[in-house]
Amino acid sequence: MSMKYLMLLFAAMIIRSFANSGNAIETTLSEITNTTTDIPAIRLCGPEGNGYCFHGICIHARDIDGMYCRCSHGYTGIRCQHVVLVDYQRSEKPNTTTSYIPSPGIVLVLLVSIIMCCLLFVYRFTRRTNKLPLQDMVVP
């Protein structure tokens, strides 16, 4: 918004300089902003737009200086008169890429289970070898 006011101030200074033909310029930003009205870029049409849009809201856009329709979901066209048969943007497709990614919790449980199985195997193997008599372990 400040750029808009600076441009208005600059334009007013130039106009005054031509009008005053060399006199001192005493225009301030408050003088310019008090005289200008701020028109919104987009506003509702009002009574003249009743019935203009078939399936949507009538909007008056300052840039195009005319009525414009903002269509409801499922409709398209200048006056929202056409039905959209297939809406690809809003159709829900199964997200296959994320369904194959395991969660960190599952990976952690699987890793702990593998470590526990390895420790159990080592414990049983060392227990068996400790129970054998020394004679069986010595080769003649």
Curated annotation (Swiss-Prot):
Q: Which residues are glycosylated?
A: 34, 95
What changing residue 113 to G does, per the record, is: In strain: Garcia-1966
Q: Name one GO cellular component term.
A: extracellular region
Q: Where is this site: Cleavage (By host protease)?
A: 96-97
Q: Name one GO molecular function term.
A: epidermal growth factor receptor binding
* Alphabetically ordered keywords of this record: Disulfide bond, Early protein, EGF-like domain, Glycoprotein, Growth factor, Host membrane, Host-virus interaction, Membrane, Secreted, Signal, Transmembrane, Transmembrane helix
* Assembly notes: Variola growth factor interacts with host EGFR and promotes EGFR dimerization.
Q: What is this protein called?
A: Pro-variola growth factor
Native species: Variola virus
